[in-house]
Amino acid sequence: MEMTSSYIRDSIKNQCSVWIAQRQGRAKDGFDRTEIALLKMLMLAFKKESAPLQSFLEEINLIPVSISYELDPCAVRKARELRLIDDSGSYEKAEDEDLNSMIAGLVGYKGRVHIEFGQIDRRAVDSIEKLGEVLDQAIVRGLRVFETNEFADSFLKGESESM
C-alpha cells in the first residue's frame, strides 16, 4: 500500500491525474460505495493522517466521475451468479471468470454512454466517512437514467409485464 500511495502522491505532485476506482470489484446491485480504506490510503499518500481533513482536501482535487450506460454487457453474467447464489447459497467462480468479465465489461456493447464529472462541497466534509458519503452522493447525482433503466424499474415493481 505504501508503494501505491507513493505513486499517487508523485503523480499528483507532477500534476498528473490519477483515476481510482471506488472499491475493488463491482457491486451486483449497481451501486458502488466508496471504500473508506481507499480514502485513508489517499490521506496516507500525503502524510496527512494526523492533519486536518480540510487541508488534505485543499491539496488534492477529488473529482467524482459518474459513468452510465444504456446496456450492461455483463448483465446476464451478474444475473446468473445472483440466481445461483439465491438457489444454492453460494457461487464458485471458474478460473479466469473475473478476467473474462472485465474484458466483456470493457469491450462489450453498452449502447449510449454518459460520463459526468461532478464536484464535492468540501465544506460539508468533517470526517473521512462523510467524505465517502459526499463522493457517493455526487456520483449518484451524475448518473443518467436511460429508458432501459426505467423499464427495469417498472418491471421490478410489477408495473410492466412484457419485455
Model-derived regions: residue spans:
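Membrane-interfacial terminal anchoring regions of lipid-handling membrane enzymes
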Residues: 2-18, 24-163
